[in-house]
Amino acid sequence: MYKRQVEYGGELRCVQVDADGIHEVEIHNDVFKAPEIQEEQTVTTSSVADVIISLRGNRYIQEKTFGNISSFNFTSKAFNDRVWDEQTTKARGLYIDTFKGRVAARAYDKFFNINERPETKFDMLQNKLQFPVTAYVKENGFLGLVSYDEYNDDLLIASKSTIEGPFAGWLKDMIYEKVTPENIENMKRFAKDNNVTFVFECVDMKHDPHIIEYPESNLYLLDIVYNQINYAKYDYDAMCDTAHRFGLTPKKKACELATWQEFYDWYYDILEDDYEYNGRVIEGFVIEDSTGYMTKIKLAYYNFWKFMRTISHEAIRNGYIKKTSALTTPLANEYYAWVRKLHDTEDPANVPRDICTLRRWFYNDMKQAEGDSLI
């Protein structure tokens, strides 16, 4: 006897043996109970109230409260232990009005570097990416969010995790410096009417220089994202049109790649040590395929000087580093020999720690040394 979900209206199948031989018999069940379908409970299909409960119950997610609004972000332990699931990837620059049960502002779901995760291994991308794919220049600053604050009829300006603190303050200062009062008012009205967040890369060379040096501080509008749990955003052309209306600088589309072969060739070209985009060094690229799937690439110049920043901090503090075997290139060894001497200055505590300044000093000293050698 074989049951084919007979309890849910299927058939009971059996074998009957009689004088005429062996026969298969199926008896259909017309009296049955409907199956109880277990729906997958995820943050993308739940109500906002359910999401709040779910996020608060996750030990890898940190909540910060600002009156009725809370920010939810993955913890450093989640990052270090690579605890990535639908909740921890969602909790990145996510602001929820927990009193009204609505999203107040939001950034991207977390996405990963090529080769950082099993699903982003380069060889896996051939089957993962849906072509054409678009590459956008990845500027090197900190993430900033601008939405509508209905409680104060003002802009809600936030960093990735807080509406207080220095980063939110620097972002606010930058907005009021770069955007006219009229356009600030227009942005506020636009964010309110369309229930969206302006997502920025804030390059602040005065307060927070990163790895790539810029001639001046600037704001780059990355995307306009809907204030909802399910991630959705304006398309690139609509985002650019809106940016230009408000006097903002949109992110730069670098290229569109129609096939895997085009992507493959481009990928290995940009990984060259001396690669520059339109004559300048950049952090990397964000890749977005035709379905919205995103991954990113960090380039050689950025990776090298990010590593040398760590070397610098240890060398200035101690006068040496423990693992000199990590210095695998002539440039790395030359820079290390230079930067460790800063430990012996009269006041090493006041030596700049940002790599942009240190790198500039290093090259200036190298140029001067070359000039002296010619005399």
Label every model-predicted segment.
Residues 1-42:
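Feature recognizes metal-dependent phosphohydrolase scaffolds
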